[in-house]
Amino acid sequence: MKKRFFGPIILAFILFAGAIAIPSSWLTGFITDKRVKESATALNPSMFQGLYLQDQMLKDPTYLPIYGSSELSRLDEFHPSNYFQVNNEGFTPYLVGKGGSQSLIHSLNFAAHMDQLKGKKIVFIVSPQWFIKRGSDEQHFAPNYSALQGLDLAFNDQIDPEIKKKMMKRMLRFKAVQNDAILSELYKAMVNGQTWKVNALKPAAKVYYSMLEKKDLYYSTTESSGPKRYISQSVKDKSWSELNKLADQSGKRHSGSNDFHIDNPVYKKLKPKVPKLKGKNKGRSYAVSPEYGDFEMMLDILKDAGAEPMFVTIPVNGKWYDYTGFPKKGRTDYYKKVNKQIRAKGFQVADFSGHEYDPYFMKDTIHIGWKGWVYVDKAIDEFYKTGKVTSS
């Protein structure tokens, strides 16, 4: 009876251990080109937090990765994923990021893909609302944090040791990392230079890493592509001035219910709160935030990796921000500061901070849309073809 009971358990353990021991490089061939293409607009967290789909994408010169946060999901006819699908310029946008994906999350992701970033053109959209006084918090960090990428950082010898130490110290401030016993102890030992402890923890950490790696590989080969996306032909073969006119018309049609040029369905939900929000943000600013330190780490990683990024700095909805009392200085100081950081590294930047009051540039209070996407499309097109950007 005991043999019957323990036999399947022992067999399952042997099979599990065998699966973990198989080198992942043997299995990456199961990630098809079709699977990578499907994931380009799926906005699936399994891809953001993994390694393999992004690895395959970064190796392919026909993909242009676009990193950002919640604005990437605002898919409309002017969105880069639609525009460059119907206007073939030789590349396919690949979207990486979701709400709460801020500088530290992207730093971790870039560190995990340093060997694929050299000479790679990428686009990175920076959002002002990341730079609040407290910076990234647990609510936004935890759902986007990747234990696999966190462990990859610990074993990463390509990253500058000082940047690596800064990243580990910063990440140890979050409960999502603190509650991961193996990773948090490994980080602490590395930060404090406790070599004996690092060596003692490494075997368990490597088994843990291998388990997460196989899980990522499974997701990379089997997950569905998500809901079918509608492709609009309305932007095909149009000049930039024609696209601007079309975006104006679309924005006007979809935001006619309010004076803030906010998308009608969004404003419908916001409307009951509008009177209470008047003047509520007096004294606030985006000029002081720990996010600047996280952003600097990310810039350093991209610089060390030899990546070729174009940053897109988007504005806020000026009319709405004025209504809520958010001081203009608290916004302009941010624009100046973040653009200075980017340019100091020698990176290209499409600075759209001058469009706060441009109707239909923003789709709501903080997310780009309609005309804003047209400007972004133009900047991407110019950057991809010339390596430089003059759009603003």
Swiss-Prot record:
Ranges in the topological domain labelled Cytoplasmic: 1-4
Compartment(s) of residence: Cell membrane
Residues passing through the membrane, by range: 5-25
UniProt KW keywords: Cell membrane, Membrane, Signal-anchor, Transmembrane, Transmembrane helix
Pathway participation: Cell wall biogenesis; lipoteichoic acid biosynthesis
Membrane topology: Single-pass type II membrane protein
Domain of life the protein comes from: Bacteria
GO biological process, one term: lipoteichoic acid biosynthetic process
Primary localization class, coarse: membrane
Extracellular side: 26-392
Gene Ontology CC entries for this record: plasma membrane
Family: Belongs to the DltD family.
NCBIfam families named among the record's database cross-references: LTA_DltD
PANTHER family assigned: PROTEIN DLTD
Role: Involved in the D-alanylation of lipoteichoic acid (LTA). Could be responsible for the transfer of DltC-carried D-alanyl groups to cell membrane phosphatidylglycerol (PG), or alternatively of D-alanine residues from D-Ala-undecaprenol phosphate to the poly(glycerophosphate) chains of LTA. D-alanylation of LTA plays an important role in modulating the properties of the cell wall in Gram-positive bacteria, influencing the net charge of the cell wall.
Name of this protein: Protein DltD
Organism: Bacillus subtilis (strain 168)
